[in-house]
Design a protein with these regions (language model features):
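Domain-level signal for soluble alpha/beta catalytic cores
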Residues: 1-332
Length: 332
């Protein structure tokens, strides 16, 4: 069974946070590879791959169907900030190989496990003039190649804050497909902030209109906020997207308590809201983002693990989009 077959059969459950669960391991400066690499989780692939393996295994242990590679910050743009841009291909290949090996250890004929090659937004957004579109697309190429060559079953372009950034990542993926004459599934996920749009002001309707024409397999939302603040935008996506839809919320909004970042959604409250997204809105893929622990995902698996996808009957509104708004093609 491949990933798209599984998506037709059940609500697919992705893993939770990599970063906050690595932080919970209380790694030393030496573990990170020195002060210059602190919080560069990709460098742990060289210094403490066992820590990455521990996080992956913790989510597979509770029943998640898909784990994401430890490559969210693995683009050439981000790695250049740590002085390791030349390792971009190797970092991403290692991340995918490690995840693929662990997923293989857990996979059975009755419960296959899959690896999603994670591609984050990076630190430079073209719409804000930080980087040109062409340079950003070029920076994604080595990441995409490494994730594919390492054995990723699908790509997930996630936490997208800028439609041009999203398109650059997707273009790099589809160029690889054309070059290699291959195809694996692609998910595109945008981040809607508490003020109701993407970081640069794009509303969810404009994001759907702009991204749906790409040959992606799933469109969705992740990060930014907890499930409460995602509800209206995700409902819109479920009611209007002809594609399968995904939602991977944070464990609420972060706040600092006693010098530590804390998220306010308990595993039980988080799972209840994710269950609502699947049963009532028709989410095809659920999972967690920042602050979500294996316990959060265990509760999600218990509530959602046996669900079949809900028929949504969504109908895409013919429209054009600017960087900010959707303009439907309607006549009076």
């Amino acid at each position: 069974m491949n990933f798209l077959d599984l998506l037709k059969e059940k609500v697919v459950i992705f893993d939770g946070a990599m970063g906050s669960n690595l932080q919970a391991l209380d790694l030393s400066i030496d573990d990170w590879g020195g002060p210059q690499f602190e919080n560069c989780s990709e460098n742990l692939l060289y210094t403490r791959p066992d820590a990455i393996e521990k996080v992956h295994s913790s989510f597979l242990d509770v029943g998640c169907d898909v784990i994401e590679t430890n490559s969210f910050g693995g683009s050439e743009v981000v790695l250049a900030e740590f002085g390791i841009a030349e390792k971009t291909y190797d970092v991403n290949r290692k991340a995918a190989e490690l995840a693929r090996r662990i997923a293989g250890d857990y996979s059975t004929s009755d419960k296959p496990r899959f690896v999603a090659g994670s591609i984050g937004p990076g630190t430079k957004l073209p719409t804000l003039g930080h980087i040109t579109y062409n340079n950003l697309k070029a920076a994604y190429r080595e990441q995409v190649r490494g994730l594919y060559d390492g054995g990723s079953d699908l790509f997930i372009v996630e936490t997208c804050q800028d439609l041009l950034q999203t398109k650059a990542a997707l273009a790099a993926i589809f160029e690889l497909f054309e070059e290699r004459k291959v195809k694996i599934p692609v998910i595109a996920q945008v981040t809607i902030e508490v003020f109701g749009t993407m970081l640069n002001g794009t509303e969810i309707g404009a994001a759907l209109t702009a991204l749906e024409p790409f040959p992606i397999d799933v469109i969705g939302m992740n990060c930014g906020t907890g499930p409460k603040h995602m509800s209206d935008s995700f409902r819109y996506l479920c009611e209007n997207s002809p594609l399968p839809v995904s939602v991977l919320p944070n464990a609420g909004l972060p706040e600092v308590k006693d010098g530590q970042q804390h998220y306010d959604e308990t595993p039980e409250s988080f799972a209840a809201q994710v269950d609502h997204f699947a049963k009532d809105f028709g989410a095809n893929i659920v999972g967690g983002c920042c602050g979500t622990s294996p316990e959060h995902l265990k509760q999600v698996v218990e509530r959602v693990g046996g669900l079949s996808p809900k028929r949504r009957g969504a109908k895409l509104v013919p429209a054009a989009s600017s960087i900010y708004f959707q303009q439907p093609f309607t006549q009076d």
